A protein has these predicted regions:
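PLP-dependent class I/II
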Residues: 2-252
Length: 252
């Protein structure tokens, strides 16, 4: 356990990396990942998603050539945001297995941040990294929490999950203070949320489903030049404002 997913990621990185090691992200991605990488003094390798321009399907595709090139360069860790924040993109089983195969070939640890998984909309399938068998277990650590799905971030409890003996042995070297700082109330709330919180979560997802389609309709009618792909997961909206011609510094 840890106080939150950010602390969990940082502490896992401290166990498995040294300052100066390389770590992979795929942008656009949650801003705090960059803060965690700076905190652990790692070198960022960014392999951005590529946009297909096809709005009828998932417009964000993985740059596999870029991913393998990064892995082959001596990469230590790949942080996978699954489901992806802020794109609302789901990874397929085939994509995850391909990442696992690369991680085994190049001896890379995959940290799978699955905090947004409970907020998956009906008709989409979330695939946990650790559900994919022994190979996935041997190359990955999962971090997650009930904080996004059940809105209990303030209760300060996250989960670090491994199903591999060698990885568990290394995680056991983590300072015990990391676990002790997690909230006892948060631990109980997390257990109850995951085991008994389905009715409440279903109602939240229903509201979010309405909101994501309402936003699409509003943009189509009021700001048709703004591109928005309806996400498959969570409450985030990633809007492409390029055609508004706001300039290089829109906040200025």
């Amino acid at each position: 356990a840890a106080t939150d997913v950010g602390v969990a990621v940082v502490e896992v990185l401290r166990v498995f990396t040294n300052p100066g090691d390389s770590i992979l992200l795929s942008s656009p991605v949650y801003q705090n990942f960059y803060n965690w990488i700076n905190e652990t003094k790692l070198n960022l390798v960014d392999v951005p998603f590529e946009r297909t321009g096809n709005e009828s399907a998932n417009p964000w595709v993985i740059n596999w050539d870029g991913i393998e090139k990064a892995y082959a360069s001596g990469l230590k860790v790949h942080i996978l945001c699954s489901p992806h924040n802020p794109l609302g993109r789901m990874y397929t089983k085939e994509e995850l297995l391909r990442i696992v195969a690369l991680a085994k070939r190049y001896d890379v640890l995959v940290i799978s941040d699955e905090i947004h998984a409970p907020l998956t909309f009906k008709g989409n399938t979330f695939v946990p990294m650790l559900s994919l068998g022994n190979d996935a277990e041997s190359v990955s650590v999962t971090v997650t929490a009930a904080s996004k799905g059940w809105n209990i971030a303030g209760l300060k409890c996250a989960i670090i999950v491994s199903q591999n003996e060698a990885i568990n042995s290394r995680l056991a070297t983590m300072p015990m203070a990391v676990h002790y700082r997690a909230s006892l109330l948060g631990a109980f709330a997390t257990a109850i949320a995951f085991s008994e919180g389905e009715i409440w979560l279903d109602s939240v997802i229903e509201n979010l489903d309405h909101n994501r389609h309402m936003l699409k309709d509003l943009l189509n009618s009021q700001l048709p030049s703004v591109r928005y792909h309806i996400p498959d997961n969570s409450y985030l909206a990633w809007l492409d404002l390029e055609k508004l011609n706001l300039g290089a510094d829109p906040a200025a």
